[in-house]
Regions:
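Class I SAM-dependent methyltransferase Rossmann-like catalytic core
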Residues: 1-43
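S-adenosyl-L-methionine
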Residues: 75-120
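Conserved SAM-binding loop of SAM-dependent methyltransferases across substrates and taxa
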Residues: 54-66
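Short beta-strand element of Class I
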Residues: 68-71
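Class I S-adenosylmethionine-dependent transferase superfamily signal
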Residues: 61, 100, 137-141
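Conserved class I S-adenosyl-L-methionine
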Residues: 43-53
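A generic alpha-to-beta junction signature in SAM-dependent methyltransferases
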Residues: 41, 64-65, 104, 144-147
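Mobile active-site "lid"/loop adjacent to the S-adenosyl-L-methionine
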Residues: 106-148
Length: 153
């Protein structure tokens, strides 16, 4: 992190608000806004948060979904959040897919993801890598659309 990036963050109103409200990331407000528009947080659902660390979106989900099953998955560690189970690993590997399947024993109702690829400094390459990650989430969600697993083969 550069000094100019840190200064920019501290001037950002969402950064400040996230710290006051105890959210781990400013992106928590994106998810709150999305839910206000699309109302996908309904009581008693199975929710999967892919690319969850540092946990801002999982925090929001936990606040809205007190009686739901929430599983957060990331290759990076994540500090504990009430009402959220955490699985460290890559959701694209068979081992982690099996663990996700066992965790939900039934269908996944909602998948959320705010993943981005590690940046290289090359904006074009970073964009391509992040788009590839998004496509992997879409492919994963189509596998689990009507329960686990979705086998059309």
């Amino acid at each position: 992190m550069t000094k100019s990036w840190i200064i920019k963050q501290h001037r950002d109103s969402f950064f400040k608000k996230s710290k006051v409200l105890g959210y781990r990331s400013r992106s928590a407000f994106k998810l709150i806004e999305l839910n206000q528009k699309f109302k996908f947080f309904k009581n008693k659902i199975n929710l999967l948060d892919l690319g969850s660390s540092p946990g801002g979106w999982s925090q929001v989900a936990s606040n809205f979904l007190k009686k739901s099953k929430i599983l957060a998955v990331d290759i990076e560690p994540m500090e504990r959040i009430n009402n959220v189970s955490f699985l460290k690993g890559n959701f694209l590997t068979e081992d982690i897919k099996d663990k996700i399947s066992k965790e939900f024993i039934g269908k996944i109702d909602v998948i959320i993801s705010d993943m981005a690829a590690k940046t290289t400094g090359n904006k074009s390459l970073d964009c391509i890598r992040t788009n590839e990650l998004c496509m992997e989430v879409i492919n994963f969600s189509s596998e689990t659309q009507f329960g686990w697993p979705q086998n059309d083969k």
